[in-house]
C-alpha cells in the first residue's frame, strides 16, 4: 500500500493529475479500488491549452501505463522554464531543467540523468518508465500473440485484457498456463500438474497420485480386480482404456500412421513412441550413469534401476518388479497365457513385442544394421547385444563367481545356477527348469511338436537352434575355424571337440599308453602321414609332432 501511495504521489508530481470525485490517496488509505482520476498533461504556461482524458485505473500496473500515456501525450517540444498543473490544483512545479527543446524520440534515447537530474526523480523514473516497451508503439512490432484467435498486441497487458473475451462466464483459468476449465474443482486438480502435489496415497505400497481416480485404478493391482472384460477372448483389464486398446488386436485395425516412414500402429501412444526412432536427439540424461533418452518418461523409468525400488510383487513366486506392466507380463509365465498369436504359423506369445519381432521371420525384414560388420537384425535390442561382440564389453558381473556377461538378462539367468532355483515345472512329468523357455522346449517332448521345419528337405525340429545347425548342411558353410591348425567346421560344438583333442594330445603325448588311442582321434580329425591317406592311423612320430613333443622316440 505504501508503495502504491508513493507511486501515485510521484505520478501527481510528474504528470499532473487532477482528481475528480474522491481523493485517490484517501481511497488508497481506505483500501478502496478502483478509483477514478482525471489525468492532465503538463502544458506551457497556459492551462487552457491542456487536453485531458478520464479512465478507470487499477493499482500498480495501470498507474505505470497511465504515467507513460501522460508522458507520451506531451507536446512535441518542451521549451519552458515553468510548468504548472491544471486549474484546480494547488501545487505548482517549477522546471529549471528544460531550457532547450527535446523531440519525443530524443527524450526516449536520452539518459535518465539528462531528463531528471534530481536523484529522487531519477529513481522514480527508473521504476515506472520502460522505454523498450514504449518503442514497440513506434515500430509497429506486436510480439504478444493470442493463441485462440492469432490477434497480436504490442503490450503483454493488452494481451491479458484481450484474453478475457475468450473466457466464458463462470469459467476458471489457470494462471500458470492459461488453460480454461468449466469447474473450479477441475482447475484445482489441474494445478497439481504444475505444483507436483500428490495428495492421494496408497495404503498398501505407499505410492502417491495426483488424482483419486488414478489411486482407485492403482488399488486394483493389489486386489487383483479387473472389471473390464473383452467379449472376444475373455481377457480382463483394470482400466476401460486398456480394454479399448486391446480390442484393436482382434480387429487388426491400424489407423495411426507414421508420416516419416509409413509404418502403421493400432494405438496413438505406440505411434508417439515410434516417432522417437526418427529423432536422434536425446535431451534427457541420467545424472547417475549419463545414459541419455529421447523421452522424459523413459528417463523416469530408468531411474528406478538405480533406486532399486520394486513396488509390484508377484503373489505366486514373490518376485518383485518396478513396473506394474512388467508384473502383468511376468504373471503369464505362471498362468501360461499367450494372448498374442501369429496368423501366419499359429505360434503364440505372452508379450505383444515378441509377436512383432516374430513376424519379421516370415517377412524377412531386418531393419537394424550393424555399422561395423553389416550384419542386420529384426530387433533393435538384438543389434545392441551384437555390438558388444565388437567392443568386447561385459558390464554385468556375477557377485558370486565373478563371471561377466554382456546382457543383464544373461546374468539373471546365470544367478539361478548358484541358487538352484527351478520355478518352472512340467505338469506332465514333474521335471523342473530354471527358465520358462527350457520348460516350453521340454514340453515338445511330450507333445511331439516340431514347429521348425527345413525348407530345403522338409526335416522338422523342436528347437530353432537345431534347425539353424541343420541348415548349414545344405549351405556347406563352415564359419568356425581352428586358430591352431586352420581347419574349419560348420558347428561351434565340433570346433570345441576338435580343440579338446589338441589339448589332450599336448597333455598326454609323452605317455606311450595313450598315443595309440590319440592316433585314432587324430585320424578322425584329419591329420595324415601323406596326402590321400585319410582315415588311416598316423605313425607315433606324426602323433608326437602334432602334439608338440619335438619328434623324440618313445
From Swiss-Prot:
A molecular-function term among this protein's GO annotations: DNA-binding transcription factor activity, RNA polymerase II-specific
Positions of C2H2-type zinc fingers: 116-138, 144-166, 172-194, 200-222, 228-250, 256-278, 284-306, 312-334, 340-362, 368-390, 396-418, 424-446, 452-474, 480-502
Domain of life the protein comes from: Eukaryota
GO cellular component annotations of the record: nucleus
One of the Pfam families matching this protein, by short name: zf-C2H2
Domain KRAB: 1-47
Subcellular location per the Swiss-Prot or TrEMBL entry: Nucleus
Keyword Manganese on entry: no
Keywords: DNA-binding, Metal-binding, Nucleus, Repeat, Transcription, Transcription regulation, Zinc, Zinc-finger
InterPro entries: KRAB, Znf_C2H2_sf, Znf_C2H2_type
GO BP terms: regulation of DNA-templated transcription
Record carries keyword Ion transport: no
Recorded family membership: Belongs to the krueppel C2H2-type zinc-finger protein family.
Function: May be involved in transcriptional regulation.
Name used for this protein in its record: Zinc finger protein 714
Species, as recorded: Homo sapiens (Human)
Taxonomic lineage from the root: Eukaryota, Metazoa, Chordata, Craniata, Vertebrata
